[in-house]
Amino acid sequence: MTLRRSILAFTGGMILVLALICSTFMCHMMMGTLSDLEEAYVHQKVDGTLFYLQEDLSSLKRAAEDWGHWNDTRDFVIGENDQYIQDNLNSWTLSGLDVDFMIYYDRSGNLFYSRAFNHATGEEVPAPGRLLSLAKDDPLIAHSSPEDGLTGIVSDPEGLLLVSSTTILDSHWKGPISGTFIVGRRLDGARAEGLARLSGIDLRMAATAPVGESEGTNSKTSLLIVKEDSDTLIATKTIDDVYGNPTVLLEAQVPREIRSRGLETIRRQVVGIFLASLLFGGLILLFLELSILMPLATITSSVEAIREQEKGQGSRIPTVGPAELATLAESINEMLDHLESYNQKLAMSEKRFRTIVDTAHDCIFIKDPKSRYVLVNPVMERIFQLPASKMLGERDEVFFSAETAARIREKDAGVLSGEPFVGEVSAHTRAGSSMTFHAVKVPLRDDRGQVTGICGIARDITDIKEAGVELLKRDRLLSASAAASYSLLVNYDIDQIIIDVLQLLGEAVEADRAYIFENQTVDGEVLMSQRYEWTKGEVEPQINNPVLQSLPYHPDSSTFYEIISRGRPYVGLVKDLPESERAYLAPQGIVSILIVPIFVEDRLWGFIGFDDCHRERFWSNGEISVLQVAAGSIGGAFIRSRTRADLVRAKGELQERIGEVEAKNAEMERFVYTVSHDLRSPLVTIQGFVGFLREDLSALDGDKIKIDLAMIEEAVLKMDHLLKDTLSLSRVGRVVNPPEEGSFGEIVHEALSQASGELRSRGIKVSLAEGWPRVRVDRLRVQEALTNLLDNSIKYMGDRPHPEIEVGWRPEGEETVFFVRDNGIGMDPDQWEKVFGLFYKIDPDSEGSGVGLAIVRRIIEVHGGRIWIESEEGRGTCVLFTLPTP
């Protein structure tokens, strides 16, 4: 677009925008005023409707007072005017008063008489039921003074009612109050239409809630105005009924006449303002075109014609327009004269220089003082894979990374100050490749000796440098592999040495992450899990990533598994891998990956992997070969570690078995001693009383014979209890039921059912926890343990006035702790461990054999749990234990 067109377009656009802004502002301001007028109009209409409604109620109140304060009405209510109904309560009377019903209540608040007519049909109809069953304290009939009265709206199931109630007095408006006179009109559709005609709007009135629901409320709402459509507004307002409750809804449809007329006026004014603005803008544009833009266009077209000529010799610009533009044309003509002479000299020099530049095998370039390329040769085009047209005028930031460009600018600054540069330059291109150049840069000077640019020659020595770097990397990798192999041979701590080996190898190959995965087979499916990992400080570790545990090879990594199972490395860029593999590699930030399989005894044990999370890297064959050797060393280390672990485990199991045998022998000795001692006591008792029995039989002493037999029977029963408890203890751990998974709460309820009789007889309150966890146990044994604990709590409850037992659970770390707590007699801390001993009793004279807690402990320990006591003498006992959960 030419300058002329740009100026015209810009100026015209600004004028148009200003016209639109003025029109919009005017429209917005007037629309706000129009909305206020429309709202005021709606308020006026609704207020008019309410005024007419109030006038209707006022006329009704006057009728009520005229009839209520009348001797005939008073005599009728007190039963002294039998002609009142015939003379006064007929259809033409009600029609003349414009009322639909009259209702009379006596001074006791009881309904005395009611009459209602349908004026359209002239027939008598029932009075509104809502007014025939008023409570005696209803404000309509409950009066505290002769002046009392209520006028308003009442909600009836059949519709709204206009009602006025007043006291019944004599014709002089004096008491006493003889009753209540209620007169009213139905606020039906016809009456609502009459109000609508008076106010000039469509009107609807209805109850907001069923009769009686709104009594007691005090809320009031203001007028709510909403738009139904573009032509109608809906105004709603809640009106208080005769009781002061907002139960009457008034809804009015108001035509938007003001809005229609106002919008038309606004449209006309906006169009007028817009057209006036356009006319003014057109005059401004015409002035610019004639005085400035047309002369400027003539000069511009002449310059363009000269530029398009092959050499532009002999062509000049006409001097037209104002003085400033004519002077500009003359200056341009002088410049053209100098330019023709300079071009001739430059053409010959350019031809010579171009021959040298185009045939050189090194990069040749020239930069201006701002380090912009003004000349590049074909070698630079080939290296950067860009045509010269894309390179000229650009700085080094376009071709190199920001860091490289900054270093080049620093060297260029020295050259521009007059100091030549000779040396190597390491560069990173924007495409991500690394290059090394041997560069020579010298300053370019003009005829006055001023530096006008930089001329440089650069030779690409990247291949030479990379070859040297690769040799150094291979030496470092071989050294790391040798050190890793040595460490794997001489160290036994396989877990720590593997981490050290991963660090050695990872640093040697300049990886960001090195790791080892181990395979395992579950239900015939081969899974892989990460076991070891080393990472650089800035790279996020993945050793705790649950996604990398028990990860199946199939189907997402089938190709990967097929490659490494053949002993081949898996290498590549993550972006080029299948989508199924990228799904879990990309979230780890991996860019390039190398996987080397680890075989143990000719079986794919797992693999060692190396990640580069910062660059797209292509692993060399030399690196892969060395890492394959290292993977073999790691596999051998795992074989040796497993062999050592098997030996240590076998030795440990042997020592454990020896310890178990020794412990069982010691336990057996204690058991035999205790059983022989406790069983001998009943036998001695039996033997002694058998002697007494012989003597008593000889003496034929019947009473003593009974005593002797009772003591012998008691000793036999004691021996039977001891034998049963001993047998039960011996079965724990030997007679085992299959473990079952279920709620621990079910086991608790089963144990409580066995002890329920004793609990009820002792009046013991039992509290149970909620949300019981699931356990996998021998249900019968655990139920037996709980029953013993409940029996102990009952037995040692003492004489507590409010005995209680609590059975519950709580999580503690990775364990689930169950407990049975009572508020019994408790025990000293020095008894906490003793009570689990065989046949041990705190009170030797108490019931039982002292085997119960020993059985409980044995049951818990057989399940792999532990049991302990928390107690204080006089403050109850809590037995706690753990059990395995699924």
UniProtKB/Swiss-Prot annotation:
Induction: Transcriptionally regulated by FilR1. Transcript level increases with cell density.
Domain HAMP: 290-344
Subcellular localization(s) per the UniProt record: Cell membrane
Record Gene3D superfamilies: 1.10.287.130, 3.30.450.40, 6.10.340.10, Histidine kinase-like ATPase, C-terminal domain, PAS domain
Catalysed reactions listed for this entry: ATP + protein L-histidine = ADP + protein N-phospho-L-histidine
EC numbers, comma separated: 2.7.13.3
Segments crossing the lipid bilayer: 7-27, 270-290
Annotated ranges, domain PAS: 349-419
GO MF, one example: protein kinase activator activity
Residues modified to Phosphohistidine: H677
Major location category of this protein: membrane
Any one biological process term the GO annotation gives: osmosensory signaling via phosphorelay pathway
Record's comment on post-translational modification: Autophosphorylated.
GO cellular component, as recorded: plasma membrane
Residues of the PAC domain: 421-473
Keyword annotations: Cell membrane, Kinase, Membrane, Phosphoprotein, Transferase, Transmembrane, Transmembrane helix
InterPro entries with a match to the protein in the record: CHASE4 (IPR007892), GAF (IPR003018), GAF-like_dom_sf (IPR029016), HAMP_dom (IPR003660), HATPase_C_sf (IPR036890), His_kinase_dom (IPR005467), HisK_dim/P_dom (IPR003661), HisK_dim/P_sf (IPR036097)
Topology in the lipid bilayer: Multi-pass membrane protein
Name of this chain's protein: Methanogenesis regulatory histidine kinase FilI
